[in-house]
UniProtKB/Swiss-Prot annotation:
GO molecular function: rRNA binding; structural constituent of ribosome
Cellular component, GO annotation: ribonucleoprotein complex; ribosome
Protein family according to the UniProt entry: Belongs to the bacterial ribosomal protein bL9 family.
GO BP annotation list: translation
Protein name from the UniProt record: Large ribosomal subunit protein bL9
Record function comment: Binds to the 23S rRNA.
Pfam families in alphabetical order: Ribosomal_L9_C (PF03948), Ribosomal_L9_N (PF01281)
UniProt keyword annotations, A-Z: Ribonucleoprotein, Ribosomal protein, RNA-binding, rRNA-binding
Length: 150
């Protein structure tokens, strides 16, 4: 019996795959547990339509990520911070991914999720710093930060 997998099933198939499996296994396990459905011409057509829509959505997300990268890597896009500095040259407060994301939105109206900003640890130094950002699995960019003494 041909089935379309609705979920990943270890050793049998991945979500969206169309495979031939034993009839008993399909009816008594896969279909009952909503892990798969019978592959009819109608369900195959629905699957193809969903896959096309998903590909289109992924292409839009990729295009948006490339647009954001272009905006971030513009020479004028330098996020400015003004922090109090102690005698050792380190800031009193630290600059986190959340702060960077908020300032980017406030200063340049560019939205970047704080989870995409790749900071190993919060920034406590002053000066010019470049921070890597992973906008998409294929698109990486750098945010330029200028941290001045208040």
């Amino acid at each position: 019996m041909k089935v379309i997998f609705l979920e990943d099933v270890k050793g049998k198939g991945k979500k969206g795959e169309i495979k031939e499996v034993p009839t008993g296994y399909a009816q008594n396990f896969l279909i009952k547990k909503n892990l798969a459905k019978e592959a009819t011409s109608q369900t195959i057509g629905e699957l193809k339509g969903k896959q096309k829509a998903e590909e289109k959505a992924q292409a839009e997300i990729l295009a948006e990520a490339k647009e954001t990268k272009k905006a971030l890597e513009d020479e004028k896009t330098v996020v400015s911070f003004s922090e109090k500095v102690g005698p050792d040259g380190r800031t009193f407060g630290s600059i986190t991914a959340k702060k960077i994301s908020e300032e980017l939105k406030k200063q340049f109206d560019i939205t970047v999720d704080k989870r995409h900003i790749e900071l190993d640890h919060p920034i406590r130094a002053i000066g010019l710093i470049e921070v890597p950002v992973k906008l998409h699995k294929e698109v990486k960019a750098e945010i330029k930060l200028r941290i001045d003494q208040a």
